[in-house]
Amino acid sequence: MKNTKTSQEQVIELKLSDRQKKVLKSIVDEYTISATPVSSKLLVQKEFKDQSSATIRNEMMFLEKNGLIEKQHISGGRVPSLKGYDFYNKNLINKNNNVSDNFKMRLHKILSKRYSNIDEILNAAVSIINETTQLPAVVTKTSSDELLKRIDLVKINDNSALVLIVTSSENILTHSIKLDKNTKFNDLQTCFSVLDERLVDTKLSLISSKLDLIVDIVRNKLEEVEYYFSKIVHRVFDFYAYKPNIDSKTYGVKYLTKHSEFEDQQKLNDLLNLLEDSTIWQQIALNKKTDGLAKIMLGNEIGHEHLAIATTQINLANTNHQITVVGPTRMDYAKIKALLDFLKIEIEKILGSTNEH
């Protein structure tokens, strides 16, 4: 019978003894710090002083046979494989990893300041994440549930006008409109004035479905109302009905030079391409599986073999902000996860969350 289990399911099912788990964890932790293949001799010196080198070698052979560690170079040391990192993150990661008092103090200082909006708070917080992890991060803002606070129409010239939409998160969205011979600016302004009166505090994503209810109101004030709604108004708001507003920004790219992996130009290019690929950040931001605490995704999950990401979603009243730390597979997962979890919990606690933990 054909085995249909995925490699991740097989990792979870793999049974290791307590000593084998400790050996694997020691290899991951040591390699994270040193970036050097780990030998049985080193493990005995540091973690297993009451064990012989032969015993630890046998345990390492078992781990290698099961694909959890691998030989990287000619040297006798071993490094974690993707399968090994996956097992580590699911079973061995230190869930009680303490966030430093310095990080807590700096974050609380940011949250106590009177910033104008959440974007400025996150910009300041992510800079601390960059500095602490020595890794870049991507912040993705999804605002499909923003509320309409004001809508206005501004005439640019005889041939064009600009729709201004102010949202509940203080974003100002603009849409340009061409004015042809069949379009009277004053009539169009009447349409948008009624929308401004009737649709305040409506979700942008729902406005398109409510426009038909507004037509009868406008019809009492304006002839040819169907023309203006079908040709112009619907086009403006249909955009929000089908496509949430997603914006991504990258911070801390300068820290890539701190990591030996990126002395390899190909690996550096791979990461830079990932950072510039807006589609993957949109997919992560729209993935509701990241609503909980920090999620770790390895190279085989994101299509980049030598890279990994740790991501968390901060849920506020009308916007979601995805913060994703990006780096080599040899990153300090426990530390990064603890930082992201703390950041999420503190910001949602102070600014208000749409979810409960």
Swiss-Prot record:
Gene3D superfamilies: 3.30.450.40, Heat-inducible transcription repressor hrca homolog, domain 3, Winged helix-like DNA-binding domain superfamily/Winged helix DNA-binding domain. Pfam families: HrcA, HrcA_DNA-bdg. Transmembrane segments: none annotated. InterPro entries: GAF-like_dom_sf (IPR029016), HrcA (IPR002571), HrcA_C (IPR021153), WH-like_DNA-bd_sf (IPR036388), WH_DNA-bd_sf (IPR036390), WHTH_HrcA_DNA-bd (IPR005104), WHTH_transcript_rep_HrcA_IDD (IPR023120). One of its GO terms (molecular function) is DNA binding. One of its GO terms (biological process) is negative regulation of DNA-templated transcription. The keyword Zinc does not apply. SUPFAM superfamilies: GAF domain-like (SSF55781), Winged helix' DNA-binding domain (SSF46785). HAMAP family: HrcA. Belongs to the HrcA family. Negative regulator of class I heat shock genes (grpE-dnaK-dnaJ and groELS operons). Prevents heat-shock induction of these operons. This is Heat-inducible transcription repressor HrcA. It comes from Ureaplasma parvum serovar 3 (strain ATCC 700970).
